Design a protein with these regions (language model features):
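Short amphipathic alpha-helical segments, especially helix-boundary/capping motifs
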Residues: 26-32, 47, 75-82
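Glycine-rich FAD pyrophosphate-binding loop
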Residues: 8, 12, 19-44
Length: 97
């Protein structure tokens, strides 16, 4: 069976999903081709940086305000460093989980 679409997206990860959303919202017929059966486990995949939050906002995907994170904490032995996310004109001053 063959099907014709306006936009074929290879890979259903973050970039492919964003491309598919934008294409569909622009009126294109879209097909996403993903080799994996479903999503995969990724240890660091739950944390969103301010850049990722801005990208989701640009796609009109809501972020639950109760799951905001204000920065990073790094621990090496007994040393602990905390770094707040800086707020810029391009990105919010928070990430999300």
């Amino acid at each position: 069976m063959s099907e014709q679409v306006d936009l074929a997206v290879i890979g259903g990860g973050p970039a492919g999903s964003a491309a598919a959303i934008r294409g569909a919202r622009a009126g294109a017929s879209v097909a996403v081709f993903e080799s994996g059966e479903r999503g995969r486990d990724k240890i660091c995949g739950d944390g969103l940086t301010p850049r990722a939050v801005a990208a989701l906002k640009e796609l009109d995907i809501p972020i639950d305000a109760s799951h905001r994170i204000s920065g990073l904490r790094m621990i090496a032995g007994r040393q602990i460093r905390e770094l707040p996310w800086p707020e810029t004109d391009r990105f919010p001053g928070y990430g999300a989980v």
